[in-house]
């Protein structure tokens, strides 16, 4: 995250795919604080307005609770994909150094679709 005050003090906000995976796995089973709060968080994430990566090519019947992000050359999306059979999976897509961020986001969306199709 571009946090200028932190950066000027030699700090930088970072995450890893594993960090995000662990958070979303806990959310998916209701283990972030408690099941009620986890459900509230998932409901908020289902209202994400930017759907140009994980959900972009998925069938409209598939719900996704996710959070994307972008800063200079970086595109990310991570979340829980809820399948029609009441199962779900966690997907974390992190990238950097795309020359064309729009094409990069579309490539990540295609990766999301491939993963979805492989799990059917």
State where each predicted segment sits.
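Short glycine/serine- and small hydrophobic-enriched flexible loop segments
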Residues: 22-29, 96, 113-117
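Short, Gly/Ser/Thr-enriched beta-strand-loop segments that form substrate-interacting elements
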Residues: 52-85, 89-106
């Amino acid at each position: 995250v571009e946090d200028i005050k932190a950066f000027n003090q030699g700090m930088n906000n970072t995450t890893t795919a594993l960090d995000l995976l662990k958070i979303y796995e806990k959310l998916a089973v209701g283990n972030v604080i408690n099941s009620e709060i986890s459900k509230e968080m998932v409901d908020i994430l289902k209202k994400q307005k930017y759907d140009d990566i994980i959900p972009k090519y998925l069938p409209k019947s598939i719900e996704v609770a996710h959070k994307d992000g972008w800063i200079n050359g970086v595109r990310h999306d991570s979340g829980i994909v809820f399948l029609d059979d009441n199962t779900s999976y966690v997907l974390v897509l992190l990238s950097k150094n795309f020359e064309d961020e729009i094409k990069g986001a579309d490539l990540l969306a295609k990766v999301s679709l491939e993963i979805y199709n492989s799990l059917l």
